[in-house]
Amino acid sequence: MSGEAEKTERAYVYMVRCAGGQLYTGWTNDPASRLHAHKSGKGAKCTRALVAQRFAYLERCTDKSAALRREAALKKLTKAQKETLCAEWAEKNLPRLSLATRADAAEILDIYNWYVLHHTATFQVTPSSLPEYEDWVDSTRALIPLLLARDGDGKLLGYACAHRYHPREAYDWAVESTIYCAPDARGFGVGDTLYRALLDILDGMGYWNVYALVADPNPASERIHARLGFTCVGREPHTAYKFGWLGLSTWWLPLRRGNEKPEPTHPLTQEQVEEILGRYQA
């Protein structure tokens, strides 16, 4: 099943917050793409005029018919009722960051294997096993903190990490980043929050360069990387076959610049990591 085919099986009702505080209500099969359309002036006339900014409310429905009924019900609410609903949603759904342990491997694996089966964000086609991912969590967090984002009920919304860009010693100051959000968590800032915290940690550890390998095409991933300051420095066509032929693009973010010999990278203390995560708490 391709990522495009998967979208038609999901339906959501949402409210978008505009620059003047107004709320626009609608429904969609793909929250991330719909929010981008609103923000880029390609959505509804109302959000073009009022300047859409972010999701204020997002609710998954069983199908399109249910989403349309829920949309109609939301539109009948008073402004005060809508604001109460949005406040409750924000309290529950805005991300709380923490550090992963081996015990989190099963939840992380559930998110990753969804992308393996349904999306081209990863070129892996065979799902990973829990023992594999328990070992992966241990090896990943041994080098750089593995970050989690959870909602107010403890549901895992996404994770972010980094690993060596290349095993040879001269690459010691370069890492490749990885970030995945749960399918239902895409489009309302989880990825941005995780990624910014990860980049702050990498900067604090003394890394110079962060690279991201992105399936081509993957416009949503390209948007988040461009927004965070990454530059596309190369595209390889026809690199992999998954739901059709795909290219691969390399995105680069320099954390430092210069020609001097770099200082060795170093781990951060628990207190330093917690201070960084605290900057991004809901």
Language model regions located:
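GIY-YIG nuclease catalytic motif and its immediate N-terminal context
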Residues: M1-L94
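Acetyl-CoA-dependent GNAT
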Residues: R17, P127-D184, Y195-R196, P254-R256
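A short beta-loop-alpha structural element at the N-terminal edge
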Residues: R96-I108
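Conserved GNAT-fold acetyl-CoA-binding loop/helix
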Residues: L109, N113-W136
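Conserved catalytic-core motifs of GNAT/GCN5-like acyltransferases
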Residues: C161, Y211-V214, T231-G247
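Glycine-rich acyl-CoA binding loop
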Residues: G187-Y195, L202
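Conserved GNAT acetyl-CoA-binding A-motif
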Residues: L202-V214, E222-I224
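C-terminal "cap" of GNAT-fold acetyltransferases
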Residues: H238-Q281
